[in-house]
C-alpha cells in the first residue's frame, strides 16, 4: 500500500533489500553495515532529496547516513519511551506496567530513536478493554507467560492492536 501511495503522489521511491544484501555477503550483517549505508546513500544521491522517510527500514542508521540526509523515522513509542522494534517496545511497556504508549515521527540521529520529534500521538493502554488483561498479568509470572505465549499473549496482542490502529 505504501509503494502505491508513493507512486500515486509521483514521489521517487528507493528500495534496497537488506536481506538480499546480507545473503550476497556471507557473515554477520554488522560486518557490512557501513557498506549497506553507502549503497543506500549512493541510491539516494541521484535524487538530491530534501527529506527521506525510513518507512519499514528496521535497521539502525549509521552516523554518516544521518549526516548525509534528513531522515524521518517512524517509531512505535512516545518520545523518550522505549527504543527498539515494535515487538521490543511492547515487551518493555508490559514489563514497566505502562499506562500509555504512542507513536512518533522523529529525525533519525546517531542516538537511536531519540532524535528531534516532529509529531507524536498518545495511546492509552490501561482501563477499558485493557483492565482485565493487566489484572490477569498481575496474577501470573511475566517471564513464564512470555516464554509460553510469546507475542500471542492477549495483553501483547491488545497493545499491538491499539498501536496499529493509529499507524499510517
Labelled PLM ranges:
Residues 1-168:
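One-carbon transfer enzymes
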Amino acid at each position: 500500500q505504501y509503494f502505491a501511495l508513493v507512486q500515486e503522489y509521483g514521489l521517487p521511491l528507493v528500495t534496497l533489500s537488506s536481506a538480499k544484501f546480507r545473503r550476497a555477503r556471507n557473515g554477520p550483517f554488522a560486518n557490512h553495515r557501513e557498506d549497506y549505508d553507502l549503497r543506500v546513500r549512493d541510491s539516494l544521491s541521484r535524487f538530491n532529496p530534501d527529506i527521506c522517510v525510513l518507512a519499514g527500514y528496521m535497521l539502525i542508521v549509521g552516523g554518516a547516513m544521518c549526516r548525509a540526509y534528513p531522515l524521518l523515522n517512524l517509531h512505535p513509542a512516545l518520545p523518550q519511551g522505549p527504543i527498539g522494534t515494535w515487538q521490543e517496545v511492547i515487551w518493555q511497556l508490559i514489563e514497566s506496567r505502562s499506562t500509555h504508549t504512542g507513536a512518533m515521527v522523529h529525525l533519525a540521529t546517531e542516538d537511536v530513536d531519540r532524535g528531534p520529534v516532529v509529531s507524536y500521538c498518545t495511546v492509552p493502554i490501561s482501563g477499558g478493554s485493557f483492565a482485565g488483561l493487566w489484572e490477569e498479568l498481575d496474577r501470573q509470572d511475566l517471564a513464564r507467560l512470555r516464554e509460553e505465549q510469546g507475542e500471542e499473549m492477549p495483553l501483547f496482542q491488545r497493545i499491538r492492536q491499539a498501536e496499529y490502529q493509529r499507524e499510517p
